[in-house]
Amino acid sequence: MNMNKLHLSKSKTHYIIVVFLAILSLSIHPLCAQNQCSVPGLPTIRIATWNVKDCSATNQKTKEAFLLHSFIAEAIKEARIDIIAFQEIQIEGRKGADIALLQDALMSIDWAMPHVAWARSPLNDDLAILSRFPITESQTILAPSEQPWPRPVLEACIDLGDMLLYLYTAHFKAYADQESLSARLAQAQALASHIRQYFGQSIKETAIILAGDFNTVSSYDMQSKIGTVDLLQLRDNEDSTDDFLSLNLEWLNFKPTYKSKSYASITDHIIVSPLLAAKADKNSIEIIDPPPTDKGFSLSDHKILVFNLDPSRLCLWQ
């Protein structure tokens, strides 16, 4: 009788322990699920766009040309940029060999960017992406051909480790006349259509960045729903769940990204997909004045836009 009581007591105790552990497991699991988005220790990835104006300058009096690759490399390292989209850069065999010269200059100052993608432009103003992270795929899309725009778009897929980043860079047609505006609107609509078709429903959960010189110099470019910027932000419909966001328009108080002797304008943008926009704030975007050269002039009339991608704020590193 006593043995039976002892056996029943042990069984009861075992049962209570099992139930307790089960409850504890259920209570802990949601907590882990809530905290899995926070991954401390992951470094911020700095992604930039910059129109470098051929990586050269000419003395208008003497017509002497100055190559600026070493200065541009120093500016990239100083800003600690990991991935950069370039406009007005020349592919080897064209007007220059900017990509190779830049990579050499970066290597010489211990800031190697060995991964590169590029797209040729009929106007000799080529596009390129340099990266410290592997570029797994790249392609030229929206080639001008019979289209009204003068330059293509460069698309690249970059492996950030546990996440893929899709980066698009472009250099839209300049000037405020109606023909130039129409070309920008047409290319913006074509790029938005390409992105919608390529990503489908996954567009809301994918890291996508549009970074470049979109030459949004006209007030119409900024028009709600129908302007160049809102077309690129996919805001031309009633569905707000797939809206992209121009970080510099949102957080930099309309600071100009281009400045010449005659005027200043917001021509350059970093526009991010819903996944990245949801985690962005005023610290996610910055504008950097290009430093002067030893000759006293600036490296470019365009400023550098930089997006601080903080992986620890995304639910993708698990």
Please describe what each predicted stretch is.
Residues Q90-F172:
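Structured beta-strand-rich core segments of catalytic domains in phosphoester-bond hydrolases
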Residues R46-T49, D82-E88, A117-W118, L127-I129, ...:
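Structural recognition of the beta-strand scaffold that forms the well-ordered cores
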Residues V52-S56, I89-G93, S121-D125, P134-T136, ...:
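Solvent-exposed loop/turn segments at secondary-structure junctions
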Residues I17-S27:
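Bacterial N-terminal signal peptides
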Residues Q34, P148, Q197-I209, T216-Q318:
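Metal-dependent phosphoester-hydrolase catalytic domains
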Residues N4-I17:
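Bacterial N-terminal signal peptides that target proteins for export
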Residues K63-A75, I84, P152-F244:
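Extracytoplasmic, non-cytosolic globular domains
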Residues I16, L31-S108, A119-D126, A188-Q189, ...:
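N-terminal, active-site-proximal structural segment of metallo-dependent hydrolase catalytic domains
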